[in-house]
């Protein structure tokens, strides 16, 4: 009973709460699905027999809703994913390292896990972020600092030395000297 626990998380605001409820098709819920608008809580919800046409598959979820889609082959799954915009994350569950490597190589996504979910967000050593429709850049740790930092490059040329070699007309000796310095 997650909704009765004091330590169970809340949805950030009513707009997001209502958006999430709009993604849940009660006819496809196999567990969870309860919610409390007063506390902005939604029970972890698993939906089965989901298709790419369902509302829950039309946008990134960012909430306690797990749509389950089934496939007859990995190629079918990859082709269906390619028909959509790039996912922010990809989670593949398999014991077969070759299948995992193949899927990861064939699908563009921001970050992900093999045989787990969300754990890639827990380390500041790994950047997280999307590309394409899911965003740009990376966040977390040094990568996040670098993403949101503007580096200002400056050259402080002293005025007491202004080499004529920099200016036209160029002479053959100038080219030879430049090549010698650039080696």
In which residue ranges do the predicted regions lie?
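Short secondary-structure junctions
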Residues: 28-34
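Conserved C-terminal structural/oligomerization subdomain of aldehyde/semialdehyde dehydrogenase
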Residues: 41-183
